[in-house]
Protein backbone atom coordinates (compact mmCIF):
# COMPACT_ATOMS: atom_id res chain seq x y z
CA UNK A 1 0.00 0.00 0.00
CA UNK A 2 1.19 3.51 -0.84
CA UNK A 3 0.51 5.94 2.01
CA UNK A 4 -0.68 9.42 0.99
CA UNK A 5 -0.39 11.98 3.81
CA UNK A 6 -0.20 15.23 1.86
CA UNK A 7 -1.75 16.79 -1.24
CA UNK A 8 1.03 18.00 -3.53
CA UNK A 9 -1.10 20.47 -5.49
CA UNK A 10 -4.01 20.63 -7.89
CA UNK A 11 -3.62 20.19 -11.62
CA UNK A 12 -6.85 22.07 -12.34
CA UNK A 13 -6.26 25.01 -10.00
CA UNK A 14 -2.50 25.40 -9.75
CA UNK A 15 -0.79 26.76 -12.90
CA UNK A 16 2.56 25.43 -11.67
CA UNK A 17 1.30 21.86 -11.45
CA UNK A 18 -0.67 22.21 -14.66
CA UNK A 19 2.55 23.12 -16.46
CA UNK A 20 4.65 20.57 -14.59
CA UNK A 21 2.35 17.69 -15.52
CA UNK A 22 1.88 18.68 -19.13
CA UNK A 23 2.49 15.49 -21.09
CA UNK A 24 2.46 13.31 -17.96
CA UNK A 25 0.50 10.08 -17.70
CA UNK A 26 -2.38 10.32 -15.23
CA UNK A 27 -3.43 7.46 -12.98
CA UNK A 28 -6.77 8.44 -11.46
CA UNK A 29 -8.14 7.82 -8.01
CA UNK A 30 -11.87 7.98 -8.77
CA UNK A 31 -14.08 9.04 -5.87
CA UNK A 32 -17.67 10.07 -5.42
CA UNK A 33 -18.37 13.17 -3.36
CA UNK A 34 -19.05 11.18 -0.20
CA UNK A 35 -15.71 9.37 -0.44
CA UNK A 36 -13.91 12.64 -1.10
CA UNK A 37 -15.01 13.95 2.31
CA UNK A 38 -13.11 11.24 4.14
CA UNK A 39 -9.66 12.25 5.34
CA UNK A 40 -8.82 8.56 5.70
CA UNK A 41 -9.70 5.82 3.26
CA UNK A 42 -8.15 3.01 1.24
CA UNK A 43 -8.87 2.53 -2.43
CA UNK A 44 -7.17 1.43 -5.64
CA UNK A 45 -6.42 3.76 -8.54
CA UNK A 46 -7.56 3.01 -12.08
CA UNK A 47 -4.13 1.49 -12.74
CA UNK A 48 -4.36 -0.74 -9.67
CA UNK A 49 -2.23 1.17 -7.16
CA UNK A 50 -3.29 0.40 -3.59
CA UNK A 51 -3.57 3.84 -1.99
CA UNK A 52 -4.03 4.61 1.68
CA UNK A 53 -5.25 8.17 2.22
CA UNK A 54 -4.32 9.60 5.64
CA UNK A 55 -4.76 13.38 5.62
CA UNK A 56 -5.19 15.86 8.44
CA UNK A 57 -8.77 15.85 9.67
CA UNK A 58 -9.50 19.34 8.35
CA UNK A 59 -8.31 18.43 4.84
CA UNK A 60 -10.61 16.95 2.20
CA UNK A 61 -9.81 15.94 -1.35
CA UNK A 62 -10.81 18.04 -4.34
CA UNK A 63 -11.11 17.18 -8.01
CA UNK A 64 -7.68 17.49 -9.63
CA UNK A 65 -5.62 17.05 -6.46
CA UNK A 66 -2.17 15.59 -7.12
CA UNK A 67 -1.47 12.73 -4.71
CA UNK A 68 1.85 11.53 -6.09
CA UNK A 69 4.19 12.13 -9.00
CA UNK A 70 7.03 9.94 -10.19
CA UNK A 71 9.39 12.15 -12.19
CA UNK A 72 11.25 9.15 -13.61
CA UNK A 73 8.19 7.50 -15.10
CA UNK A 74 6.31 10.80 -15.52
CA UNK A 75 3.21 9.27 -13.92
CA UNK A 76 1.00 11.26 -11.56
CA UNK A 77 -1.84 10.01 -9.38
CA UNK A 78 -4.71 12.49 -9.70
CA UNK A 79 -8.01 12.66 -7.82
CA UNK A 80 -11.08 12.49 -10.04
CA UNK A 81 -14.33 13.29 -8.28
CA UNK A 82 -17.64 12.67 -9.97
CA UNK A 83 -19.21 16.10 -9.53
CA UNK A 84 -22.89 16.82 -9.28
CA UNK A 85 -24.68 19.14 -11.66
CA UNK A 86 -25.20 22.69 -10.41
CA UNK A 87 -28.09 25.13 -10.51
CA UNK A 88 -26.76 28.54 -11.57
CA UNK A 89 -28.89 31.54 -10.54
CA UNK A 90 -28.03 34.80 -12.34
CA UNK A 91 -28.36 37.82 -10.02
CA UNK A 92 -27.33 40.49 -12.53
CA UNK A 93 -30.96 41.30 -13.29
CA UNK A 94 -31.30 42.60 -9.74
CA UNK A 95 -28.86 45.44 -10.47
CA UNK A 96 -31.61 47.09 -12.50
CA UNK A 97 -33.94 47.16 -9.51
CA UNK A 98 -34.20 49.46 -6.52
CA UNK A 99 -32.00 48.89 -3.49
CA UNK A 100 -35.03 47.89 -1.41
CA UNK A 101 -36.17 45.35 -3.98
CA UNK A 102 -32.64 43.97 -4.36
CA UNK A 103 -32.26 43.48 -0.61
CA UNK A 104 -35.71 41.91 -0.30
CA UNK A 105 -35.13 39.46 -3.16
CA UNK A 106 -31.68 38.42 -1.92
CA UNK A 107 -33.04 37.85 1.58
CA UNK A 108 -35.96 35.79 0.29
CA UNK A 109 -33.71 33.78 -2.02
CA UNK A 110 -31.31 33.02 0.82
CA UNK A 111 -34.22 31.99 3.03
CA UNK A 112 -35.67 29.72 0.32
CA UNK A 113 -32.34 27.99 -0.33
CA UNK A 114 -31.60 27.66 3.37
CA UNK A 115 -35.04 26.22 4.01
CA UNK A 116 -34.14 23.39 1.64
CA UNK A 117 -30.81 22.81 3.44
CA UNK A 118 -29.04 23.45 0.12
CA UNK A 119 -25.39 24.44 0.02
CA UNK A 120 -24.63 27.51 -2.08
CA UNK A 121 -21.72 29.66 -3.20
CA UNK A 122 -22.17 33.23 -4.46
CA UNK A 123 -19.61 34.52 -6.95
CA UNK A 124 -19.49 36.73 -10.05
CA UNK A 125 -23.11 37.85 -9.57
CA UNK A 126 -24.24 34.22 -9.62
CA UNK A 127 -25.36 31.70 -7.03
CA UNK A 128 -24.18 28.10 -7.45
CA UNK A 129 -26.27 25.36 -5.84
CA UNK A 130 -25.27 21.67 -6.18
CA UNK A 131 -28.13 19.37 -7.12
CA UNK A 132 -29.35 17.13 -4.33
CA UNK A 133 -32.77 16.43 -5.85
CA UNK A 134 -34.15 16.23 -9.39
CA UNK A 135 -33.88 19.34 -11.55
CA UNK A 136 -37.67 19.44 -11.81
CA UNK A 137 -37.88 19.73 -8.03
CA UNK A 138 -35.34 22.54 -7.88
CA UNK A 139 -37.14 24.27 -10.74
CA UNK A 140 -40.39 24.04 -8.77
CA UNK A 141 -38.79 25.54 -5.67
CA UNK A 142 -37.57 28.54 -7.67
CA UNK A 143 -40.85 29.16 -9.45
CA UNK A 144 -43.25 28.59 -6.58
CA UNK A 145 -41.28 30.96 -4.38
CA UNK A 146 -41.68 33.71 -6.97
CA UNK A 147 -38.17 33.83 -8.44
CA UNK A 148 -39.28 33.53 -12.08
CA UNK A 149 -37.64 36.89 -12.82
CA UNK A 150 -34.23 35.50 -11.87
CA UNK A 151 -32.68 33.60 -14.80
CA UNK A 152 -31.38 30.20 -13.75
CA UNK A 153 -30.02 27.14 -15.51
CA UNK A 154 -28.49 23.77 -14.76
CA UNK A 155 -24.83 23.19 -15.60
CA UNK A 156 -22.31 20.38 -15.27
CA UNK A 157 -20.15 20.53 -12.17
CA UNK A 158 -17.05 20.37 -14.36
CA UNK A 159 -18.16 23.60 -16.07
CA UNK A 160 -18.47 25.46 -12.76
CA UNK A 161 -15.37 24.07 -11.03
CA UNK A 162 -12.83 26.27 -12.89
CA UNK A 163 -14.71 29.37 -11.69
CA UNK A 164 -14.18 28.50 -8.03
CA UNK A 165 -11.31 28.72 -5.60
CA UNK A 166 -10.23 25.57 -3.81
CA UNK A 167 -12.16 26.49 -0.67
CA UNK A 168 -15.28 27.37 -2.68
CA UNK A 169 -15.05 24.10 -4.60
CA UNK A 170 -14.76 22.11 -1.39
CA UNK A 171 -17.75 23.95 0.07
CA UNK A 172 -19.91 23.49 -3.02
CA UNK A 173 -19.02 19.93 -3.99
CA UNK A 174 -17.92 18.49 -0.68
CA UNK A 175 -20.51 16.01 0.52
CA UNK A 176 -23.50 17.72 -1.07
CA UNK A 177 -25.33 14.42 -1.08
CA UNK A 178 -24.94 14.15 2.68
CA UNK A 179 -27.15 17.16 3.32
CA UNK A 180 -30.72 16.34 4.26
CA UNK A 181 -33.11 16.30 1.32
CA UNK A 182 -35.73 18.53 2.82
CA UNK A 183 -37.84 20.01 0.04
CA UNK A 184 -40.88 22.19 0.51
CA UNK A 185 -42.72 23.36 -2.58
CA UNK A 186 -45.75 25.46 -1.77
CA UNK A 187 -46.69 28.69 -3.45
CA UNK A 188 -46.84 31.73 -1.15
CA UNK A 189 -50.16 32.48 -2.88
CA UNK A 190 -51.69 29.22 -1.70
CA UNK A 191 -54.14 29.04 1.17
CA UNK A 192 -52.44 28.53 4.56
CA UNK A 193 -53.18 24.81 4.31
CA UNK A 194 -53.35 24.58 0.55
CA UNK A 195 -51.96 21.73 -1.44
CA UNK A 196 -48.22 21.68 -1.82
CA UNK A 197 -45.43 19.20 -2.21
CA UNK A 198 -43.55 18.35 0.96
CA UNK A 199 -40.67 15.90 0.69
CA UNK A 200 -38.69 14.88 3.74
CA UNK A 201 -35.83 12.45 3.34
CA UNK A 202 -34.18 10.45 6.10
CA UNK A 203 -32.28 12.92 8.27
CA UNK A 204 -28.83 12.42 9.64
CA UNK A 205 -30.25 11.89 13.13
CA UNK A 206 -31.79 8.63 11.95
CA UNK A 207 -35.45 9.65 11.86
CA UNK A 208 -37.59 9.61 8.78
CA UNK A 209 -40.61 11.88 8.54
CA UNK A 210 -43.73 10.99 6.63
CA UNK A 211 -46.49 13.59 6.54
CA UNK A 212 -49.99 12.64 5.56
CA UNK A 213 -51.37 15.98 4.35
CA UNK A 214 -55.14 15.72 4.42
CA UNK A 215 -55.67 19.23 5.70
CA UNK A 216 -59.09 20.10 7.02
CA UNK A 217 -57.60 23.00 9.00
CA UNK A 218 -57.04 20.75 12.00
CA UNK A 219 -53.40 20.46 10.85
CA UNK A 220 -53.18 16.80 11.72
CA UNK A 221 -49.92 15.11 10.80
CA UNK A 222 -49.35 11.41 10.75
CA UNK A 223 -45.75 11.24 11.98
CA UNK A 224 -43.90 7.98 11.58
CA UNK A 225 -40.50 7.87 13.21
CA UNK A 226 -37.97 5.15 12.73
CA UNK A 227 -35.89 4.86 15.80
From Swiss-Prot:
Bilayer-crossing regions: none
Region (Disordered): 192-227
Subcellular location, record wording: Cytoplasm
Biased composition (Basic and acidic residues): 209-221
Entry GO CC: cytoplasm
GO biological process: protein folding
Name of the protein: Urease accessory protein UreE
The species this protein was found in: Yersinia bercovieri
Lineage, broadest ranks: Bacteria, Pseudomonadati, Pseudomonadota, Gammaproteobacteria, Enterobacterales
Amino acid sequence: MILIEHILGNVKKDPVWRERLKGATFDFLVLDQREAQKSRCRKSSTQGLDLGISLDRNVVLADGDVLSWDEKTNVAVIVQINLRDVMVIDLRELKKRSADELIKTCFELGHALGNQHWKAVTKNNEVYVPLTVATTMMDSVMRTHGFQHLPFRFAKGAEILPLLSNSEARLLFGGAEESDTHVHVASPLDEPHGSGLHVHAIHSHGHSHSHDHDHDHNHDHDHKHKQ
